[in-house]
């Protein structure tokens, strides 16, 4: 609602278009409700014209189209490694819960689905949609090699949109860049970076 005659607070009118049942895979423990926030933690991403989402303890990625129709498209089969909500409030327990699979951000290209953890389990998975193969990576190590000039490998943090949907990008801090220059003897920029310079953007194409 963008009627300019309305007050500023009414420029954008919020409205619930449709409600969906949660797909989280756990039972509430009423004894723990004073300690645990049971709100749904959801990862969203877009691919083509659809929205995809994955809930905290679910093992399924769902697709939502423009008609708000939801369909399961990927089942990850986490088995006994699905996180449980009680662990959400634990602090500094990454090693203890590392076996649990929790994705904090997802991205998809025409061929690949990238599933990445963060605080809980610092691992990542790459699913090849053509071959059906899934690769598991420890600690989100930099696994995309630079085949243009042989410089630093990188791990993407997001992808492009529209015609660039198969391009992924990452940021390299100035100190990381200079460490790479020292280690490889290659300096693609042709000059040294200082610690307070902006990070370098790396763009790669997944084929």
Which residues does each PLM region occupy?
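Beta-propeller blade signature
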Residues: 10-14, 124-133, 196-205
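Short loop/turn segments immediately following beta-strands, especially the blade-tip
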Residues: 64-73, 134, 206-207
């Amino acid at each position: 609602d963008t009627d300019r005659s309305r007050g500023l607070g009414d420029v954008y009118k919020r409205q619930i278009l449709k409600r969906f049942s949660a797909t989280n895979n756990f039972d509430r423990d009423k004894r723990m409700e004073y300690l645990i926030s049971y709100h749904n933690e959801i990862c969203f991403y877009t691919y083509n014209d659809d929205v995809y989402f994955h809930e905290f303890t679910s093992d399924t990625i769902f697709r939502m189209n423009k008609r708000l129709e939801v369909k399961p498209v990927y089942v990850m089969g986490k088995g006994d490694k699905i996180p449980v909500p009680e662990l959400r409030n634990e602090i500094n327990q990454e090693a203890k819960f590392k076996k649990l699979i929790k994705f904090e951000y997802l991205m998809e290209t025409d061929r690949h689905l990238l599933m990445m953890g963060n605080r809980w389990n610092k691992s990542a998975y790459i699913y090849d949609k053509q071959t059906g193969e899934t690769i598991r990576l420890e600690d989100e190590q930099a696994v995309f090699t630079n085949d243009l000039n042989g410089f630093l490998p990188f791990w993407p943090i997001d992808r492009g949109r529209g015609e660039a949907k198969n391009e992924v990008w990452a940021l390299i801090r100035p100190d990381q860049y200079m460490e790479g220059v020292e280690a490889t003897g290659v300096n693609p920029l042709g000059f040294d970076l200082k610690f307070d310079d902006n990070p370098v953007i790396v763009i790669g194409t997944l084929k």
